[in-house]
């Protein structure tokens, strides 16, 4: 079995058979991602095996901001009282046929690494996620995300925490 590669979504990727078990995530990659990309609302990256076009998983990144009032107290103490720039992991999904094989972790680490690169180019304080359900929330909590004050599934991970984790190979 060949190793997964993560690359920018293109027309050559086969999205038709993707099914993660969450209808909104399945429908996004099959029907809406092209318009999302054309309108510059986000960028989608897919996991494929070398030489294949079938998508095993994907994630989408977009720019966003988090309201100061929603920040965890520890973060809020250190920041000005206005919205904080973040990168949003808008979606992250793995095909049901390969769930439990660590592809979600590989996608998340790739997304966080990409977010760190973005933070070197422009002001980004953290990565934000709106977990689709409690199972997804538990997944993100394992990687150090913390809940924001507005919703337990609205999660946040500071760029400095990501940098430290990637530098120490804690995520690898």
Give the predicted meaning of each segment.
Residues 40-66, 70:
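Conserved beta-hairpin
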Residues 1-22:
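Conserved N-terminal entry element of GNAT/NAT acetyltransferase domains
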Residues 52-57, 65, 82, 98, ...:
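Short Lys/Arg-rich amphipathic alpha-helical segments
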Residues 90-100:
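A short, internal acetyl-CoA/4′-phosphopantetheine-binding micro-motif in the GNAT/acyltransferase core
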Residues 58-91:
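Conserved acyl-donor/pantetheine-binding loop and adjacent beta-alpha core of acyl/acetyltransferases
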Residues 100-114:
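Conserved acetyl-CoA-binding loop-helix of GNAT-fold acetyltransferases
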Residues 116, 122-123, 130-150:
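Conserved active-site alpha-helix within GNAT-family acetyltransferase domains
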Residues 108, 133-136, 152-159:
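Short glycine/proline-centered loop/turn elements that form peptide/ligand docking sites
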């Amino acid at each position: 079995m060949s190793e997964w590669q993560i690359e920018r979504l293109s027309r050559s990727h086969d999205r038709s058979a993707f099914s993660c078990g969450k209808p909104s995530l399945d429908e996004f990659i099959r029907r809406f991602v092209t318009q999302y990309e054309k309108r510059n609302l986000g960028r989608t990256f897919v996991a494929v095996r070398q030489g294949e076009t079938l998508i095993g998983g994907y994630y989408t990144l977009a720019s966003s901001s988090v309201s100061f009032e929603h920040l965890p107290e520890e973060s809020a103490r250190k920041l000005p009282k206005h919205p904080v720039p973040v990168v949003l992991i808008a979606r992250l999904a793995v095909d049901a046929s390969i769930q439990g094989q660590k592809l979600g972790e590989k996608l998340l680490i790739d997304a966080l690494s990409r977010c760190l690169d973005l933070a070197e180019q422009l002001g980004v304080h953290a990565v934000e996620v709106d977990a689709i359900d409690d199972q997804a929330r538990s997944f993100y909590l394992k990687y150090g995300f913390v809940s924001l004050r507005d919703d337990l599934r609205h999660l946040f991970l500071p760029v400095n925490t990501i940098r430290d984790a990637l530098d120490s190979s804690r995520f690898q």
